[in-house]
Amino acid sequence: MLLAIVLAARFRKPVPIVFGILFATLANHAVASFAGAEAAAWFDGYWFRLAVALGFIAMGLWTLVPDKFDEDDKPQESFGPFLTTLIAFFLVEIGDKTQVATIALGARYHDVLAVTTGTTLGMLAANVPAVFLGDKLVQKISLKHIRWTAAALFVGLGIWMLVTL
């Protein structure tokens, strides 16, 4: 979300930024979802389901750690808002919490299209308001509250998976 705010403030062109986020997320999450589904096909069984459940709980706890965006990580501006956003979001998502969660969801549900669609919609739901509202949004909604809610959802899903093993 912080990257979306920075890009919106820098370029002041929300539509290409939103499309950059959309296409970067689709590409990144399709690969992650596919990787999760394939891993589940290779390692299906009780221990794998247990690992996925514990992974969701770990994701919930990891969600409580705020994202960082260093000034040194500023994206290159020479490409324009769409390409800069596309590249920056794709690279920032590699190994990030949402990518790890997408891998876990792909492993759990074995449906690359549904998982990619759902996680991409989630990313857009989090980032599009940030692009259009930026600083005003952060002043109105506590990021701490959002993190705690997301953490509770991840932990709840992990516990539900443990109970249904």
Regions found by a protein language model. Name each.
Residues 13-72, 77, 129-140, 149-152:
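Membrane helix-loop-helix hairpins that form the core translocation module of multi-pass transporters
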Residues 158-165:
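Juxtamembrane boundary at the C-terminal end of a transmembrane helix
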Residues 1-41, 100-122:
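Juxtamembrane transmembrane-helix termini in multi-pass membrane transport proteins
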Residues 64, 68-92, 113-117, 121:
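Small-residue-enriched transmembrane helix starts and helix-helix packing motifs
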